[in-house]
Every structure is written in structure tokens, then in C-alpha cells.
């Protein structure tokens, strides 16, 4: 099929605003945020009246910060080479504000600086605050934004707006998530809070609802009558790198499963919303979260990688990583089975797995359909045609796309049947570069669209599900490490499926 060279209606341009990044010297700013801002500028999405201010503790001049961000764009943007004209149009609107997150003077001077930016650059008083800091600072920053009148409490259609983006984790359990929400409620407006899960900004994830609800082919069989089980897998070849301090406080369940994987599960299983709006989609996602049955201890496997070889390179075990306790009991792999107690999904097992130091980097969803109920292809009538399950594979990364596997007769044979695949890939079908997740999410926030952001109700419902499991884990000492770096997974994760007569899909 020919490439599609003409795209549909373009996304709207963003209104003027000033974006303040707290923790602007961190990896997220360099690897994700500024490459996204550069690409949005290149595509004409950002207003010429957009300004970005980095807020961090390290002493740094405007010029130093700009040069560091230019290097970051060069290193991490999906654009092949930096376009000097695009960079120059953005560069003079980038500033650095050196201050401590806990000191009042830093916020007072920030307020004065933003007022001068409004006057000079025409940002119209619109403000986007981005918390790209460790979660320990969230509440302190939120309180200071309110205390120093940096956040507007009354926001109407004709008034300037202020919005807050929070990066996960949104607490480390139900209690801390509730404490964070109490701080938000006491200081700012919940409708102005955008909890970012970058998985929701990925094109294939956004496409899940379209695949389901715009195609009778899929939605008509999207239920327990036709689906045998579902697998959602996140495999990472990397270890924890320099994130030892963070990962020791989180682990894989908190870092990946409680948020990213649960969002994928909700989109995959929710009922059709009454309308395609942020509020209605969130309503259906919350219904799903509340219908997930309590997770049994025997249906969860946790693991931690030991030393091994990944893609031909010898690597250390988790306990030998930088800033990691040499006796750490933190999990780097989780597999679990859960059930949704509603008419559509009753009895269908959902298997989720996420792990580090696995053979390769991939994230996908596999919908495994039941085998045909017709008796035409049984072993007596057709000894050479054992049927495979039909599969729908939604690839989220890399090679974003969708593949459908089904059974077909082999040409030139009598009754030989083999599985074949139809494969759609974004990069080969659409003549365009798939936008990075942060490009879409930053624009949506500036435009005031909360559809792809996580609500407080979703966060709390997810923690209600996983906090009891974390409590159980705290009382049991696992035997770690229990899988070799570069292997597929711990043995117990294979047994989780094999005792049900199933197996993880190979990749």
C-alpha cells in the first residue's frame, strides 16, 4: 500500500505562556522537555510569545543554561540536525532562575521576573509550572506557589490561567497519595493540575480507543466470549543507571505497574464513553479500576536481576549498582495476574509484566483470542493443521504499530495451516515522524486539554489496589537476585502462566 503523504487537520497552535520548570538541571529537562519544546517550535505549534524559565539550585547564567539545552536538543531530539534558525527563534526566550525550592526569596524574585516577562514578551499572564523534581519537593513547591501568589485561584475564559504539571510518582502508597492530594486541595485548584504519564502521550496508546471503537472488526469480539487472555509487557534492557537513590524508594511495581501498565489496561478494557471527552473517558477508566478484583499474593511474582550479559555486554547485578543497598530487597521485575469483575471481562485473565535488564527494549499489548470452535480443523480431520490462537499485537515501542496474526492455508499443500501476520507500522505507512510523547502532552496542557492526563481519582483507585500488596511484601523477605541480567524473566513468572496452561508470548 502506498504511503499516506497528506495528513488530516493539524493540531491547534498553543497560546502565549511562560513555562517554569522546577528541577531544570535534571535529566528529564535535557532528555525530554527541551527536545519537545524545540520540535514544537520547529512545527510552528508554540507561540512566538512562549517563554521558558528554568528554576534550579545550581548557580548558572542564562547563557550557560541555553548552551546546555542546545546540546541536549542536539543529543536527544528526534530531529536529525538542529536547525539554527529554529534554535535562534527559541534561544532568546529561555532563561534561568537560580534559587532553592524551600526559600521564600526565590519565589518572590520569580514572581517579579515573571511579571517583567509578561510585559516584555506578551505572555499574557499565562503560566505553566512543571515539577521535574524528586517527589519529596512536590508539596513544598506547591505551598510556595500559593504562598507567593504565583498561582491564580480564579480562572475564567477571559482571564490569564495557571497550570501545574506533576511527574510521577504521585505518592508511594495510598496514604502518601492522599497527603499529596490534600496539599493540592489546600493550595491550588484541582482542575489546574495535570498529572503526566508520558505513556499516554505515545501515538499507539492514543490509538487504542480508535482501534477498539472505530472498527467493528475488533469491538464486536472485544469480550470474554472471544478473548482467551491478555498480556501487557514492558521490557527494558537497561538497568537503573544513576537512578539508584530514586529506584531504592520505588521499585518496579511503583515505577511502572501502578501507573503506566494500569493506564494501558484501562484504555484496553474500558467501556465506550458516552462522548469523546476528558471527563467521560476518565469516568470509564475509574469504573474499570474499581472493578479489578483484589490481587492474590500467589498471583504476583517479583524479581531482582543479578549480574549477567545483555546484548553482548557484561553488566552488574542490581545490588552492585551505584547508590543501591548491597542487600537491597527492591524488585526490578514484576509479573502479576488480575481479573476484572464485570460482564465484558468476567473470567478473562490479564497478565502484566515489567522488568529491567531483560534481553531488549519493547513495550506491547498482546490480545490472545480463543481458538476456533469449529470442528473442521481437529486432529482427526486435519492432522497437519494444529491451529494457533489469533493474536492482536499493539506495539507501543519501538516500531510503533499494530499486527494481526491469524491462521492460513499454506499454498501448494492439502491441509497444512500456519499462522500469518498482517503488520501496520506508523513510520512506513504515514510519511511523517511520530511525535514524541512529551510534545503532545506539553501542548495539550497549554491548550487546557486534560484527556491524556491522569486524574486524582484514578491515582487513588490504583493505589487502593496495590497498597495491600506492598504491605504484604514488607513482611516477606524474598530470595534475591532470582534472574540473570539478559534472561527473559524469573522462573516463577513462567510458572505463573504455565499453571494456567498458557505461556508468555515470545518477542
UniProtKB/Swiss-Prot annotation:
<dbReference type="InterPro" id="IPR022674">
    <property type="entry name" value="G6P_DH_NAD-bd"/>
</dbReference>
<dbReference type="GO" id="GO:0004345">
    <property type="term" value="F:glucose-6-phosphate dehydrogenase activity"/>
</dbReference>
<feature type="binding site">
    <location>
        <position position="202"/>
    </location>
    <ligand>
        <name>substrate</name>
    </ligand>
</feature>
<comment type="function">
    <text>Catalyzes the oxidation of glucose 6-phosphate to 6-phosphogluconolactone.</text>
</comment>
<dbReference type="GO" id="GO:0006006">
    <property type="term" value="P:glucose metabolic process"/>
</dbReference>
<comment type="pathway">
    <text>Carbohydrate degradation; pentose phosphate pathway; D-ribulose 5-phosphate from D-glucose 6-phosphate (oxidative stage): step 1/3.</text>
</comment>
<protein>
    <recommendedName>
        <fullName>Glucose-6-phosphate 1-dehydrogenase</fullName>
        <ecNumber>1.1.1.49</ecNumber>
    </recommendedName>
</protein>
<dbReference type="GO" id="GO:0005829">
    <property type="term" value="C:cytosol"/>
</dbReference>
<keyword id="KW-0313">Glucose metabolism</keyword>
<dbReference type="GO" id="GO:0050661">
    <property type="term" value="F:NADP binding"/>
</dbReference>
<dbReference type="InterPro" id="IPR001282">
    <property type="entry name" value="G6P_DH"/>
</dbReference>
<keyword id="KW-0560">Oxidoreductase</keyword>
<feature type="active site" description="Proton acceptor">
    <location>
        <position position="260"/>
    </location>
</feature>
<dbReference type="Pfam" id="PF02781">
    <property type="entry name" value="G6PD_C"/>
</dbReference>
<feature type="binding site">
    <location>
        <position position="57"/>
    </location>
    <ligand>
        <name>NADP(+)</name>
    </ligand>
</feature>
<feature type="binding site">
    <location>
        <position position="255"/>
    </location>
    <ligand>
        <name>substrate</name>
    </ligand>
</feature>
<dbReference type="InterPro" id="IPR036291">
    <property type="entry name" value="NAD(P)-bd_dom_sf"/>
</dbReference>
<feature type="binding site">
    <location>
        <position position="236"/>
    </location>
    <ligand>
        <name>substrate</name>
    </ligand>
</feature>
<keyword id="KW-0119">Carbohydrate metabolism</keyword>
<comment type="similarity">
    <text>Belongs to the glucose-6-phosphate dehydrogenase family.</text>
</comment>
<dbReference type="Pfam" id="PF00479">
    <property type="entry name" value="G6PD_N"/>
</dbReference>
<keyword id="KW-0521">NADP</keyword>
<dbReference type="GO" id="GO:0009051">
    <property type="term" value="P:pentose-phosphate shunt, oxidative branch"/>
</dbReference>
<dbReference type="InterPro" id="IPR019796">
    <property type="entry name" value="G6P_DH_AS"/>
</dbReference>
<feature type="binding site">
    <location>
        <position position="356"/>
    </location>
    <ligand>
        <name>substrate</name>
    </ligand>
</feature>
<feature type="binding site">
    <location>
        <position position="198"/>
    </location>
    <ligand>
        <name>substrate</name>
    </ligand>
</feature>
<dbReference type="InterPro" id="IPR022675">
    <property type="entry name" value="G6P_DH_C"/>
</dbReference>
<feature type="binding site">
    <location>
        <position position="168"/>
    </location>
    <ligand>
        <name>NADP(+)</name>
    </ligand>
</feature>
Amino acid at each position: 500500500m502506498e504511503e499516506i503523504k497528506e495528513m488530516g487537520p493539524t493540531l491547534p497552535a498553543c497560546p502565549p505562556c511562560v513555562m517554569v520548570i522546577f528541577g531544570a538541571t535534571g535529566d528529564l529537562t535535557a532528555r525530554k522537555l527541551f527536545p519537545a519544546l524545540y520540535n514544537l517550535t520547529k512545527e510552528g505549534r508554540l507561540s512566538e510569545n512562549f517563554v521558558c524559565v528554568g528554576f534550579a539550585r545550581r548557580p548558572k547564567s542564562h547563557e550557560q543554561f541555553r548552551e546546555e539545552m542546545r546540546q541536549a536538543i542536539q543529543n536527544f531530539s528526534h530531529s536529525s540536525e538542529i536547525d539554527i534558525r529554529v534554535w535562534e527563534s527559541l534561544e532568546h526566550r529561555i532563561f534561568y532562575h537560580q534559587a532553592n525550592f524551600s526559600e521564600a526569596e526565590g519565589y518572590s524574585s520569580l514572581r517579579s521576573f515573571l511579571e517583567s516577562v509578561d510585559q516584555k514578551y506578551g505572555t499574557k499572564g499565562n503560566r505553566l509550572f512543571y515539577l521535574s523534581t524528586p517527589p519529596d519537593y512536590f508539596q513544598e513547591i506547591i505551598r510556595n506557589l500559593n504562598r507567593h501568589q504565583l498561582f491564580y485561584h480564579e480562572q475564567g475564559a477571559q482571564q490569564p490561567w495557571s497550570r501545574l504539571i506533576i511527574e510521577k510518582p504521585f505518592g508511594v502508597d495510598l496514604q502518601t497519595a492522599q497527603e499529596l492530594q490534600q496539599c493540592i486541595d489546600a493550595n491550588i485548584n484541582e482542575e489546574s493540575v495535570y498529572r503526566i504519564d508520558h505513556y499516554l502521550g505515545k501515538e499507539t496508546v492514543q490509538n487504542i480507543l480508535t482501534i477498539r471503537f472505530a472498527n467493528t472488526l475488533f469491538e464486536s469480539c472485544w469480550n470474554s466470549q472471544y478473548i482467551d487472555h491478555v498480556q501487557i509487557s514492558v521490557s527494558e534492557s537497561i538497568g537503573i543507571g544513576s537512578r539508584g537513590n530514586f529506584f531504592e524508594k520505588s521499585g518496579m511495581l511503583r515505577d511502572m505497574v501502578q501507573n503506566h501498565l494500569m493506564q494501558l489496561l484501562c484504555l484496553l478494557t474500558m467501556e465506550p464513553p458516552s462522548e469523546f471527552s476528558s471527563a467521560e473517558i476518565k469516568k470509564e477508566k475509574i469504573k474499570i479500576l474499581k472493578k479489578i478484583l483484589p490481587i492474590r499474593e500467589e498471583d504476583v511474582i517479583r524479581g531482582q536481576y543479578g549480574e549477567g550479559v545483555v546484548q553482548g555486554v557484561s553488566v552488574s547485578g542490581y545490588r552492585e549498582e551505584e547508590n543501591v543497598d548491597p542487600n537491597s530487597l527492591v524488585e526490578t521485575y514484576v509479573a502479576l495476574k488480575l481479573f476484572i469483575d464485570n460482564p465484558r471481562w468476567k473470567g478473562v485473565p490479564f497478565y502484566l509484566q515489567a522488568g529491567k535488564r531483560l534481553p531488549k527494549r519493547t513495550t506491547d499489548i498482546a490480545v490472545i483470542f480463543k481458538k476456533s470452535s469449529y470442528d473442521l480443523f481437529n486432529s482427526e480431520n486435519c492432522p497437519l493443521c494444529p491451529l494457533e490462537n489469533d493474536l492482536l499485537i499493539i506495539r507501543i515501542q519501538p516500531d510503533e504499530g499494530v499486527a494481526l496474526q491469524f491462521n492460513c492455508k499454506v499454498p501448494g499443500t492439502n491441509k497444512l495451516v500456519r499462522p500469518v501476520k498482517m503488520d501496520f507500522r506508523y513510520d512506513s505507512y504515514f510519511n511523517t515522524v511520530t511525535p514524541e510523547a512529551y510534545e503532545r502532552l506539553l501542548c495539550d496542557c497549554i491548550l487546557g486539554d486534560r484527556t491524556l492526563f491522569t486524574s486524582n481519582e484514578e491515582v487513588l483507585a490504583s493505589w487502593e489496589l496495590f497498597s495491600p500488596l506492598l504491605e504484604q511484601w514488607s513482611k516477606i523477605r524474598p530470595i534475591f537476585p532470582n534472574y540473570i541480567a539478559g534472561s527473559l524473566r524469573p522462573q516463577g513468572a513462567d510458572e505463573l502462566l504455565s499453571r494456567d496452561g498458557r505461556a508468555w508470548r515470545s518477542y
